[in-house]
Amino acid sequence: MNHIISHKKLTIDHVRTIMSEGMKLELGKEAEAAIVKCRKFLDTKMEDIGRPVYGVTTGFGSLCNITIPAEDLSQLQHNLVMSHACGTGETVRPEIVKLMLLLKIQSLSYGYSGVQLVTVQRLIDMFNNDILPVVYQQGSLGASGDLAPLAHMCLPLIGLGEVLYNGEVRHASELWEELDWEPVRLQSKEGLALLNGTQFMSAHAVWSLIQAERLSDWADQIGAMSLEAYDGRIEPFYPQVHEVRAHKGQIDTAARFRELLEGSEIIRQKKVHVQDPYSFRCIPQVHGASKDTIRYVKSVIETEINSATDNPTVFPDEDLIISAGNFHGQPIAIPMDMLTLALSELANISERRIYKLISGQRGLPNFLVAKPGLNSGFMIPQYTAASIVSQSKGLCMPASADSIPSSQGQEDHVSMGANAATKLVRVVENTERVLAIELFNAAQALEFRRPLRSSWTIEKIFAHYRKSVPFIEDDTYMHPLIEKSVKFIR
């Protein structure tokens, strides 16, 4: 089944389906007509326009006042892509690069960018054949768009750069020859249309949101298992509490916990303690705040991936070519920083629950193991979780609060959204690991509540998990078990 590139709203849920099912892309007639119309308008306009047009007949950045002769316009765009491919550092995950291709294709399809049809089609060919450009994590200021990473993404279009194909990094020129593909000869404005845009930031945000929704759900399931293992109380999850402070995420979290724990023998037994620590009692408020943030950020990013974000913007129907600032990443940089904080907090409260489970309280043995002293048990997994959480807290410093002028002061305010994007991915990875460690601890602790049973739902998760990770009788090599726990929730 193919996904048709059109002007219909592209949702993150559908992007998840495109990626998970390996769908191919096909350019719809509406999008094709818009691309052709805009390119034709631009070509006609260039024949009789009497003024410089930024990035079309001029240099770039602070070189915007230098007019380029008509015979050099194609070379100008070629030079732009080559010269701006200055990324460095670690390479971007292949799945995020593939998202970059999808989102760039979508943005160009609206017909406000002035690109050739053949250019968009080649991007589609690369997506459909899993030919993924090698892109680097460092180099973008998040305005004028994601110049360096998008340059690396687009180098293969002109037969340059490297691509990942069938698990092997290849020179694009060699692969193009094997496939009998000709490099695209860029026309006026095309290089700028390809490089100006927020697709590096947006792709990271989309990938992170998909993971965030998964991790938020796991945080509830694992938190519910921990609550059972700690012999916690259900009263803080009663609906009456949350109806008088009606944040949607809080209400949803409390309802989810009531559902997860329905029928539990452990939750129904008489409790000796009057109340639970905040890391259990305030789960609806904390997990709920993260849910609300995820929901908000998702709405912002969905707006972004359905937008034209290059510059200048071409309006054929209005006979306008306008140099403006849709490439600026601030509208998504701030939400990405928010999402980083929301995910970090899921890990933060998770680590506190881990700590409580190993503390020798409420009938649980010290460090959840027999013969403590001879055995260290689950002592060090908590250290690992604490280390990860501390790193994530450091990464919560908002990248979007910073700006460094560039291009001789012409580009004097930037979003640093690309830095927000890459550290967001790191916090996603960190949160996944902390939740996996909590599951490792919670499952161990739950065994000490036997013969009482938890709810059907929690017991089902527990039984499935036990197929991968066993109960720990005595000290053993923990690292493989933590990795299996990560894989389990992935």
Language-model features, listed with the residues they occupy:
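Alpha/propeptide regions of enzymes that mature by internal proteolysis
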Residues: 91, 111-116, 217, 306
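FAD-binding core of FAD-dependent oxidoreductases
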Residues: 54-68, 72-76, 83-108, 136-158, ...
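FAD-binding glycine-rich core of flavoenzymes that anchor FAD
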Residues: 112-138
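C-terminal auxiliary extensions adjacent to catalytic cores
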Residues: 2-23, 27-34, 38-41, 46-49, ...
